[in-house]
């Protein structure tokens, strides 16, 4: 193997460990053989790492020439999360845990996208804020932007001049002019000041550490125009720049720890927020190759870290990664065996001090160094003069030692000193607080002074986010106290130290809800007693929101927390185990719908990818579960290695998990051998949920082997039995018989719908009679017969009272039983009564309750009003497919939404298709089903297919829907399709029962254009847009066949044949409209006389004009973006000459007028293309025009 090239010189010497005997020659040889492919790849590419230091900032890159290296590739390893643009700039803070599902946090980006369109506003930002935890790599990222721009690899077309400022250095200046400021931001002058300032829109100002100095950057003179040579206070100059009173066109990149910038930049405009999340998994390993010059040392060090999941997770933070590498390097230099058992950042810092600082300086000089650090933190200072060092009692020998070991750095430009990293300064400041408190021993007064100083420096809201406070918690833990006592050869009083922690908690907690910051502090402390006590007290701090109308117990039953990084995942899972009010932990990925649990739980959300390292640290923390009894990983795709790690944890003696949900995790028979090994071990697992996985017969047989083991404690196993062979099902039943405590459940299995024959009250009529005209008010509209209520005297017409509210009225003439086939509603009344029925949307009510977490909507929602006592029974429809003619009422509930809140009522009976309430009280009400974890996706439902045909002369277009059998959804789809001149073709529903969340393939005869070809069966409220496939047929000269198949098994679940009965090619517009008034699509797929509501809609149309002609004035005035519309028409309707003629007009209104002038010669087909393009570019405008015109326009 080639030798690494010699290391280049740097400003700070990095001691080489060359020629020293290997710690273990055999181990090094084995390591080298294992990693040889990676080493050869690095050598081939010239990726031999070197560490460069520049003014205290560690810059890492391979030893290639600057001309050849690709800066973007080498430095974009940090994970960047672009956040959604906040609606309120004062709310730009990290969310704490809450009782509601968090909104999506954003998406991952590359460094090239920093000034790209914001995902919230779609506008390119002028201000980008790089935020992140301490030591996460913000400054490195900012310097990279400047350097990559200089090398011509980043934003070269965007900016002519880029200026970099370290705010810690900038704060040393009293006054500066704009010219002097710009000069400081350049390494060498690049152009005269007048030339630079002539194009402010091409300037980028990078302000690193904007929150570090103690300043308020207020724009004190917003209307004052200053000359570029006029000097003024630095904070005023920066405030004017950020406030846009100077160079409003300029761009800014700020780095900060906190997002609460409004406090010291009052005039800050709405920014684009990007959070730095640290190293990815592969970059943690790459860092070791960049840090250690000797490849063998790099491999040895990383293997030691990789074997410790906690240490590997800590290395996600670049500064901590440097700390780990430095400690290991010191051990190599001192000839020690590599050993690093630290579990926290605090412990790593103590280890660092013990390895780097000689004993002779620890007692006095380190204390002086701590005092220097503390004074700087309280005064927001990071640069110190020689007099500052002397003032604290630091002698020259000690300063030289601190410089040599890298604790301090000397700034060549300003002859001042700084700590190697701000985090290191904060660590020394925390030590100062403890030593000062221990020496003073002034009791509560001294503690109050320390806490008030911390609050004054960081603020109550951000107290737990401050590294100094986190280090305090770590140092005051049992291990931290031992480390300090050993380091400083002193005795610290445990009770006094514990009091200091309680002072911090008492001062801050009333002002701050539970958050990740507090969990970080508790994690650093590691004290079991403190963790248990604090986590127990958190239960009382979470209260329901003002809009929550459900019971408080439901609100506090679930906590939601966003964890973006492995570090946050580790901290959260470690602390949650001490939270006695949480019994189950659930992990949800981005855009994944949560699976409901019935036990009190914590739901962790993650918008960033979950890697193998993420799973490793999660399972590592679950080896000792304490209060946790359940783990739900449903919906997460689990690799074989992940399931292997999970099973290793389940077999660990300290793991007390009893319930495990692995629903829809992509498991196969290969994973079953691992799960079987857990069942055969002395694990505490009693319930296992494996639905929606393709386990197969072989996989289930492996599980049976585990179940047969006498030590198996499992009592409940959930499986999908319908996909298994009869032989395997028999084997499972035999197991149940031999083991009375074992219950294998799979009650929701596909089966045929049970017919409702021989049921007097519930008989569904299959023929329709001629509708009777009832006397009444003229404004009321009589509906078709399928909406009638059928009773003892025949059909009773339903009257439409309010189309917008979907409010209907029916006057039942006498006592008896009345049933409406189209809605499924059924009333039993004792006398004549008038009933009002309003179709409601579940989304109006469910969003205010936690009902969705524990129950599933299984029917329409009605607001029914009737005279008290007149209705003795109401039959409410549901679409759950029941196997038996009479089902248990235990899981079915009727949800009532009343003024004081929500009430769940148990029905008197549950039958296929409906539930029965006797002597009901009315309010908005509908049927819901109580669900167990993840059962939502394997409950069989009855569904319907809806096909709509567009009334158009020259083409045939169909819309195909697959939805649950809910009349409110069907009504909403009917209304929506009618707006666009689509009418329904009645076809039978699917024969088999289907499942929510399953996907189905739509196919048909040749030459059909189907978009999309895949449909997901999902329940969406009637107020939401429903999923459908659009099928373009063209000229329908012959019959066409449509099919729907299950995507997983490709089983045919529905099929229909459509036959053409009329051809319209030869008809003129007037003839077509005459036919249009008298047609609709029949159940058999042919054409028959229309129902009155369709004919009435056509009669009410303002004219028989095309949509484009009807709404010409509105379209000219309201189309706000014409160019996208023209792009869609180009080549189809507009030739090149017409396209350019319209674009040449100055305003959007003139462009639309020009377009309408050209449209005089267009055919109906061309106008249809215009309409389709308009619908794609301005959908809300089209819908608004339809609604205002009564919902009908022809030719569209």
UniProtKB/Swiss-Prot annotation:
Region ranges (Disordered): 1-22
Keyword Iron-sulfur: no
GO terms, molecular function: ATP binding; peptidase activity
Gene Ontology biological process terms, A to Z: innate immune response; pattern recognition receptor signaling pathway; positive regulation of inflammatory response; positive regulation of interleukin-1 beta production; programmed cell death; protein catabolic process; proteolysis; pyroptotic inflammatory response
LRR repeat placement: 627-647, 684-704
Pfam families cross-referenced by the UniProt entry: CARD, FIIND, NACHT, NLRC4_HD2, NOD2_WH, UPA-FIIND
Listed GO CC annotations: cytoplasm; NLRP1 inflammasome complex
Domain CARD: 1106-1189
Residue numbers spanned by region ZU5: 789-922
Annotated ATP binding sites: 132-139
Transmembrane segments: none
Site feature (Probable cleavage) residues: 44-45
Start and end residues of each stretch annotated as UPA: 923-1072
Start and end residues of each NACHT domain: 126-435
Extra facts: Three tandem Nrlp1 paralogs, Nrlp1a, Nrlp1b and Nrlp1c, have been identified. Nlrp1c is predicted to be a pseudogene. Neither Nlrp1a, nor Nrlp1c are expressed in anthrax lethal toxin susceptible strains, hence neither of them is thought to play an important role in this phenotype. In macrophages and dendritic cells, NLRP1 inflammasome activation of CASP1 and IL1B maturation can be dampened by direct contact with activated effector and memory T-cells. This effect may be mediated by hexameric TNF ligands, such as CD40LG.
Subunit relationships: Interacts with DPP9; leading to inhibit activation of the inflammasome. DPP9 acts via formation of a ternary complex, composed of a DPP9 homodimer, one full-length Nlrp1b protein, and one cleaved C-terminus of Nlrp1b (NACHT, LRR and PYD domains-containing protein 1b, C-terminus). Interacts with DPP8; leading to inhibit activation of the inflammasome, probably via formation of a ternary complex with DPP8. Interacts (via LRR repeats) with BCL2 and BCL2L1 (via the loop between motifs BH4 and BH3). Interacts with NOD2; this interaction may increase IL1B release.
Domain comment quoted from the record: The CARD domain is involved in the interaction with CASP1 and CASP4/CASP11. The leucine-rich repeat (LRR) domain may be involved in autoinhibition in the absence of activating signal, possibly through intramolecular interaction with the NACHT domain.
Function: Acts as the sensor component of the Nlrp1b inflammasome, which mediates inflammasome activation in response to various pathogen-associated signals, leading to subsequent pyroptosis. Inflammasomes are supramolecular complexes that assemble in the cytosol in response to pathogens and other damage-associated signals and play critical roles in innate immunity and inflammation.
Name of the protein in its database record: NACHT, LRR and PYD domains-containing protein 1b allele 5
Organism in which the protein naturally occurs: Mus musculus
Gene that produces this protein: Nlrp1b
């Amino acid at each position: 193997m080639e030798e690494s090239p010699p290391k280049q010189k740097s400003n700070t010497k990095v001691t080489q460990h060359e020629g020293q005997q290997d710690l273990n020659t055999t181990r090094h040889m084995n390591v080298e053989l294992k990693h040889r492919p990676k080493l050869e790849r690095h050598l081939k590419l010239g990726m031999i790492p070197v560490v460069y230091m520049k003014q205290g900032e560690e810059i890492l890159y391979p030893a290639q020439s600057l001309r050849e290296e690709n800066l973007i590739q080498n430095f974009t390893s940090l994970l960047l999360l672009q956040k959604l643009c906040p609606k309120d700039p004062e709310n730009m803070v990290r969310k704490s845990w809450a009782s509601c599902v968090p909104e999506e946090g954003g998406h991952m980006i590359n460094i090239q996208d920093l000034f790209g369109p914001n995902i919230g506003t779609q506008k390119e930002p002028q201000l980008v804020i790089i935020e992140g935890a301490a030591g996460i790599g913000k400054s490195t990222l900012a310097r990279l932007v400047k350097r990559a721009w200089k090398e011509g690899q980043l934003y070269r077309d965007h900016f002519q001049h880029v200026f970099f400022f370290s705010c810690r250095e900038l704060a040393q200046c009293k006054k500066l002019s704009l010219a002097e400021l710009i000069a400081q931001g350049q390494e060498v002058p690049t152009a005269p000041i007048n030339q630079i300032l002539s194009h402010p829109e091409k300037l980028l100002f990078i302000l690193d550490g904007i929150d570090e100095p103690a300043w308020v950057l207020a724009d004190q003179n917003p209307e004052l125009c200053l000359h570029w040579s006029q000097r003024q206070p630095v904070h005023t100059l920066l405030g004017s720049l950020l406030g846009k009173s100077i160079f409003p066109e300029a761009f800014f990149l700020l780095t900060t720890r906190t997002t609460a910038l409004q406090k010291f930049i009052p005039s800050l405009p709405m920014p684009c927020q990007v959070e730095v999340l640290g190293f990815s998994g592969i970059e943690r390993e790459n860092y070791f190759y960049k840090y250690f010059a000797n490849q063998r040392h790099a491999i040895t060090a990383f293997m030691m870290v990789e074997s410790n999941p906690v240490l590997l997770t800590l290395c996600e933070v670049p500064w901590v990664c440097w700390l780990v590498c430095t400690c290991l390097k010191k051990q190599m230099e001192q000839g020690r065996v590599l050993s690093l058992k630290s579990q926290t950042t605090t412990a790593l810092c103590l280890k660092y001090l013990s390895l780097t600082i000689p004993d002779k300086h620890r007692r006095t000089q380190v204390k002086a160094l701590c005092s220097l650090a503390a004074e700087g933190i309280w005064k927001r200072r990071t640069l110190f003069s020689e007099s500052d060092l002397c003032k604290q009692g630091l002698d020259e020998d000690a300063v030289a030692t601190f410089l040599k070991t890298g604790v301090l750095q000397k700034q060549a430009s300003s002859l001042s000193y700084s700590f190697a990293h701000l985090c290191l300064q904060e660590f020394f400041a925390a030590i100062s607080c403890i030593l000062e408190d221990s020496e003073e021993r002034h009791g509560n007064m001294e503690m109050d002074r320390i806490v008030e100083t911390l609050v004054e420096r960081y603020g109550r809201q951000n107290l737990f986010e401050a590294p100094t406070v986190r280090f305090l918690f770590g140092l005051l833990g049992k291990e931290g106290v031992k480390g300090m006592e050993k380091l400083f050869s002193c005795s610290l009083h445990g009770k006094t130290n514990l009091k200091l922690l309680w002072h911090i908690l008492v001062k801050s907690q009333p002002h701050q809800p539970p958050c990740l910051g507090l969990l970080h502090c508790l994690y650093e402390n590691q004290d079991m007693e403190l963790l248990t006590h604090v986590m127990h007290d958190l239960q009382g701090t979470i209260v329901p929101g003002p809009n929550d109308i459900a019971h408080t117990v439901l609100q506090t039953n679930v906590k939601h927390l966003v964890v973006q990084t492995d570090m946050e995942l580790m901290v959260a899972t470690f602390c949650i185990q001490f939270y006695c009010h949480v019994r189950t932990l659930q992990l949800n990925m981005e855009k994944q719908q949560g699976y409901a649990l019935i036990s009190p739980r914590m739901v962790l959300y993650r918008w960033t990818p979950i890697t193998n390292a993420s799973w490793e640290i999660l399972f590592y923390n679950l080896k000792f579960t304490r209060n946790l009894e359940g783990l739900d990983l449903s919906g997460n795709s689990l690799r074989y290695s992940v399931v292997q790690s999970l099973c290793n944890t389940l077999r660990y003696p300290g793991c007390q998990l009893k319930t495990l949900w692995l629903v829809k995790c992509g498991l196969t028979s290969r994973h079953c051998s691992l799960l079987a090994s857990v069942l055969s071990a002395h694990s505490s697992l009693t319930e296992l949920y494996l639905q929606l996985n393709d386990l197969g017969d072989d996989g289930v047989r492996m599980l049976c082997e585990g179940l047969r083991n006498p030590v198996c404690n499992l009592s409940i196993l959930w499986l999908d039995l319908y996909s298994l062979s009869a032989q395997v099902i028999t084997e499972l039943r035999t197991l149940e018989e031999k083991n009375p405590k074992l219950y294998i459940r799979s009650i929701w299995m596909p089966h045929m719908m049970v017919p409702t024959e021989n049921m007097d009250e519930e008989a569904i009529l299959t023929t329709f009679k001629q509708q009777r005209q009832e006397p009444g008010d003229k404004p009321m509209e009589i509906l078709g017969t399928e909406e009638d209520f059928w009773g003892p005297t025949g059909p009773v017409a339903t009257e439409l009272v309010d189309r917008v509210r979907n409010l209907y009225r029916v006057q039942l003439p006498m006592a008896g039983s009345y049933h409406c086939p189209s809605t499924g509603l059924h009333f039993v009344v004792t006398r004549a009564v008038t009933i009002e029925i309003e179709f409601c949307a579940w989304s109006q009510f469910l969003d205010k309750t936690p009902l969705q977490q524990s129950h599933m909507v299984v029917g329409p929602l009605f607001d029914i009003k009737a005279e008290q006592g007149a209705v003795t029974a109401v039959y409410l429809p549901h679409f759950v497919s029941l196997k038996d003619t009479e089902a248990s009422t235990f899981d079915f509930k009727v949800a009532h939404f009343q003024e004081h809140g929500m009430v769940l009522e148990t029905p008197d009976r549950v039958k296929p298709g409906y539930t029965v309430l006797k002597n009901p009280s009315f309010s908005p009400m509908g049927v819901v089903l109580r669900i167990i974890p993840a059962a939502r996706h394997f409950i069989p439902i009855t569904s319907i297919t809806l096909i709509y045909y567009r009334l158009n002369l020259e083409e045939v277009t169909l819309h195909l829907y697959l939805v649950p059998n809910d009349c409110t959804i069907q009504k909403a789809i009917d209304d929506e399709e009618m707006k666009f001149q689509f009418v329904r073709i009645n076809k039978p529903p699917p024969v088999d029962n289907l499942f929510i969340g399953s996907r189905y393939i739509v196919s048909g005869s040749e030459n059909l254009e189907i978009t999309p070809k895949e449909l997901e069966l999902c329940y969406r409220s009637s107020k939401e847009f429903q999923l459908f496939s659009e099928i373009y047929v063209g000229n329908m000269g012959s019959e066409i066949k449509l099919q729907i198949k299950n995507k997983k098994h490709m089983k045919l679940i529905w099929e229909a044949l459509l036959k053409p009965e009329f051809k319209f090619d030869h008809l003129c517009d007037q003839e077509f409209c005459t036919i249009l008034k008298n047609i609709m699509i029949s159940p058999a797929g042919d054409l028959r006389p229309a129902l009155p509501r369709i004919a009435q809609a056509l009669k009410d149309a303002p004219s028989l004009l095309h949509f484009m002609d009807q709404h010409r004035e509105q379209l000219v005035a309201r189309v706000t973006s014409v160019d996208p519309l023209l792009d869609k028409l180009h080549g189809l309707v507009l030739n090149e000459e017409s396209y350019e003629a319209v674009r040449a007009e100055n305003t959007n209104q003139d462009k639309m007028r020009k377009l309408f002038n050209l449209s005089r010669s267009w055919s109906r087909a061309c106008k249809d293309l215009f309409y389709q393009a308009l619908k794609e570019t301005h959908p809300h405008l089209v819908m608004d025009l339809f609604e205002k015109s009564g919902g009908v326009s022809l030719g569209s």
